[in-house]
Amino acid sequence: MEALKTLLIANRGEIAVRVLKTAKKLNIRTIAVYTEPDAASTHVHLADEAILLSGPPSKAYIDGDQIIDIAKRKGADAIIPGYGFLSENSNFARDVASAGLAFVGPSPESIEAFGLKHTARELATKAGVPIVPGSQGLVTSEDEAVKIAQSLGFPVMLKATAGGGGMGLLTCNTEKEVRESFQTVQSRGEALFKNAGLFIERYYPSSHHIEVQVFGNGQGKAISIGERECSIQRRHQKVIEECPSPFVTRNPELRKGLCDAAVRLAESIDYGSAGTIEYLVDDESGKFFFLEMNTRLQVEHGITELCYGVDLVELMLRQADAQLSGRKGLEAEFLSSIPVGAPQGFAIEARVYAENPVRDFAPCPGILQDVDWKETTGSRIDTWVYRGIKVSANYDPLLAKVMYHASSRQKAIEGLRDILTGSRICGPPTNLGFLAEILANKDFNAGNTLTKFLNNFEYNLAAIDVISGGAYTLIQDWPGRPTVGRGFCHSGPMDSVAFRIANALVGNPVGLEGLEITLSGPELRFLGPAVISLCGAPIDAKLDEAPVPMWSRVKVSAGQRLKIGKTTGGGCRAYLAVLGGFPNIAEWFGSKATAPMVGVGGYQGRQLTSGDYLTISAQIPESDNELSLPEHLIPQYPDSWELMSMPGPYDEGYLAPESIDMLYNAEWTISHNAARGGIRLLGPKPTWARPDGGEGGAHPSNLIECGYAIGSINWTGDDPVIFPQDAPDLGGFVSSHTIVKADLWKLGQVKAGDKLKFRATSLKDTLLARNELERFISDIVQCCQKGEDFGSITPLASSLPPAMSSSTRVSGIVHQIPEKGNQPLVSYRQAGDDYLLIDYGVGAFDLNHRYRVTALKKVLSEAAGDISVSNGLINLVGCGNYLPKALMIYYDGTKIPQQKLIDYLCTIETQLGDLSRAKVPSRRFKLPLTFESKRQTDAIKRYMETQRPYASYLPDNIDFVARNNAFTRAELENIYLTASFMVITVGFFTALPIALPVDPRQRMNCPKMNPSRVFTPAGQVSWGGSCLAIYTVDSPGGYQMNGMTIPGVDILGTKRGYAPEKPWLFEDFDQITFYKVTEEEYERQLALFQSGRYEYEWEVVEFDMAEHNRLLKETKEEVKAIRARQRKAQAEMDLLEKELLERWAKEKAERGVSMDTVEELLKDPEITVIEAPLNANVWKVEVKEGDKLDKDQVVVILEAMKLEIAVRAESAAAGAVVEKILAQPGKSIEAGKPLMLVRRG
């Protein structure tokens, strides 16, 4: 290339990637432009430089002035527009030239000449190219249109002269339809193309859409490069394209006429660059007529390249280079040397879109959770997508152009279909199956490719159309992801008993994915036959108005609707199994289970909603065997529960003895805050055995961090929360007892308002109950598989094992090794029948003990034999907590006896020996940090507006942390910028790193926000208790917000520094350091991260434990003085916080309405009460006093179990006026209590 050295690509998606490949081949430097939704797009990664466009994303790619300005600033020589957007904008082409740059495309005059279809027809006529019989110029009235239509003969087509892409045209078969359509086409032309002009053409119902590729040098020389057929269209949008045309192949004499006419037309206007002349070819006569000329590169240009061995983009760039060099264009001799004879072989292209085939192919944005193209010899896939990319609603949903080139048309069809059926795209629905069925169609294979081909094409789907998603419907499988850890949620069904039995009844493996339905269910339209089973809590369900029996195998016919209503009794979750599961759902770490709190797994990492699309098995057995579980085998779902639990890990020494008794003796109530991430209990307050949480925090329930077990009873302050499937795997609060594995399924069915008691159980009885439960499920599975009667199965025991008395109950500590020399005290604490927590030492936080955890974890991870990751060990969570340092071991208690595990761990302790002089491998990271950020300010503002208006830590978290530790703000910032923060654990939610300063003089302490925030931006640097944390995703949180940095997680593992098998960045004993940046510089680096181009700065180092221990010894007295100052400052801040908290609580109470007022109003016969339908939290009040209500109007939105429940004005309240609002946002309310009083007129 002589003059074209730098190229700006003014486009996105696959065409931008396609251009980049040729530009790189020609050693042209490339500049990409992109919008925020496209930040992670492939063209951004591949370009030499990428510039973020400003303005609304939907308009940024057509902001010609901005794009030209970028090109000039960045030293571009030319701009290539691709197709769409600015590619056929003559004003843009002219502006590019005026800026001294080359427009890689035809001249503005050529674009204008063919921009309006009626003038293009005139040019074609002058060039001797036959046109479709029609009007001469534009038609200005209905009467004129009718007259012309009558002279042409019906059917006719009304076309907007500025239209394109199948928009702005209608077919008319009668005079009446012409009159009805005239105004419609005019208005569409004006709305879509700013031009209301229209013309009329004769419509040929049996025709082909065939186009000829041309290339001109702008000096009167043009060549044709064969034809393509694009007859397979939906709503005039191309779906399948072929080169050569099968119709032309059968009528070879037609090729010369088509190509010669195309060349004449291009040469008649001195066309320069690539262009396409489109024809309508009558199937009966073989006559061809000019339709339009596209003055740009076509989407389907690739199949021409495959059959003719040319690179059309290269030709366009060489033409631009010649123009820049002053030669006006390529030499005629050069064009003549390009081989343009008969095509070599056959190529077919299929356009793959993210679109819903059951919703009229509506575009479907969303995250592509898996992308796996099958590529073979002969294939070419032009795409911009990959695993993890988000398809934006702002742009065309084209994902890829899949092409296949072969020696014959039949081989090309077979090869392309093989690619389509062998490729896998999970996330929003696509048209892959639709395209494959077209290729399998006998008429298509025979070459009968008329433009009306798809009018009557039948696409047989094996899928479910989600009409409505229900209150909270998730895809789950069993057992979920027990081995991932790092805060990515265990996931899986909350009630695994009902889930597994549902699968067994339909004939699935018990762990196959199904639907978990909470409180009220979805409405599903089955597009193909299916076999289903609905199990779990009693719930109303109908199949085309016929009741659906629960705990039964049910056959569903194509077209039937399953409507699952509300739960009707005890329990809150039901499970729907479908034979074959849902093949289009991607696996993440080997599971399809949804973890909605961290946005992974399932359908887009979220609950189902209207418009979602689930594929199902197309292979349905013909057998009509009915199968139902006998009533006496169906589990019971009461509203009062008793759950077996075991002490530990932190009972004695944390809770006072009388509070341990209280836990078992009290009757607890399930709060409205009962969800997959935690089930809060209402009941008596505990007495604590210690005054505070030490380095973990001011409250005795606080720890620095420790591992959490599923089923743990965790104390967040004085309130207990049970941790179910989606709970964090570590945190900073005491877990005193743990519900045993045999009773975890019951947690999935407790609902707000239910009563609950705990029963102390021995390990022996726990394992017996667990084996009994597994035997029960196994027996049912075998009967379902063999078709046997269920009569031999023993029901689940209705009674629990004998409760242990306070005198026979044991401590959570099941074994200890005394301190000896440099080997610390080791305490082994049980957490139910599947978890064991190993504690090291007694005293303040000590990295020596934390390294011992790391060393133990390494030995266990590499172990082989009876106790190993492949044999009974499930997961390991290393933490640092209040006094000791700990490792939580998650193991299978049915495979490894607890005592055997303890014995093995004791042996390892002996082998570890003295680690006080160890040299520990470490990585030291250097991250940007800005203390001032709009993201952080907005999060605090949101908190103050919606949660708590004032507190000791508001409005400035940084100032609070400084004052709480007797520092100035400058001193606190200096700590952040000079300290090395040691990562002591990675977990909680989404691999959040928790770290402490290595130098004890730089350690701090501060309370967490109360209440916790509902929103924290990703990248937030925060402090809570004694720890620093970096929030890796947008999430709730309670640590004080002190600055912003780069997050350390990429969920699908596609960004630099990550991998699908390791989507987290930080590991234990990594070190984090910060350097200060401005907010502007931070946003620049964050944009690099979001686009996948950020390069983390880190180095491999050794952490010397001996040197660290010397530091601890040398600074001991200095640290004591620092702690004394900090304790004094913290005491002052504690007093302030108590005062502000009491004032806030009082103000909230005063905003309520007195019961005397309520009772007085209720005496009025015209007053009607709108009640809360369930125990919940008031989220929003949607009306105000004095409003008149409409029927079904939403008056209040409640939040319960992480669900939004809309309370509506039913018919009795329709027309009434709101008299008194009793519910206030943020307040809890019980089922049946009044939300507001309304007065009927």
UniProtKB/Swiss-Prot annotation:
Pfam family, one: CT_A_B
A GO molecular-function annotation: urea carboxylase activity
Residues modified as N6-biotinyllysine: 1202
SUPFAM superfamilies from the UniProt entry: Cyclophilin-like (SSF50891), Glutathione synthetase ATP-binding domain-like (SSF56059), PH0987 N-terminal domain-like (SSF160467), PreATP-grasp domain (SSF52440), Rudiment single hybrid motif (SSF51246), Single hybrid motif (SSF51230)
Keywords on record: ATP-binding, Biotin, Hydrolase, Ligase, Nucleotide-binding
Co-factor requirement: biotin
Residue ranges constituting the ATP-grasp domain according to the UniProt record: 121-321
Keyword Nucleotide-binding: yes
Induction of its expression: By beta-alanine.
Binding of ATP, residues: 117, 201
Enzyme Commission number(s): 6.3.4.6
Domain Biotin carboxylation residues, every copy: 3-459
Protein name: Putative urea carboxylase
Substrates-to-products reaction catalysed: urea + hydrogencarbonate + ATP = urea-1-carboxylate + ADP + phosphate + H(+)
Keyword Hydrolase appears in the UniProt entry: yes
Domain called Biotinyl-binding: residue spans: 1159-1239
Known role: Involved in the utilization of lactams. Required for the conversion of exogenous 2-pyrrolidinone (gamma-butyrolactam) to endogenous gamma-amino-n-butyrate (GABA).
Cited CDD domains: biotinyl_domain
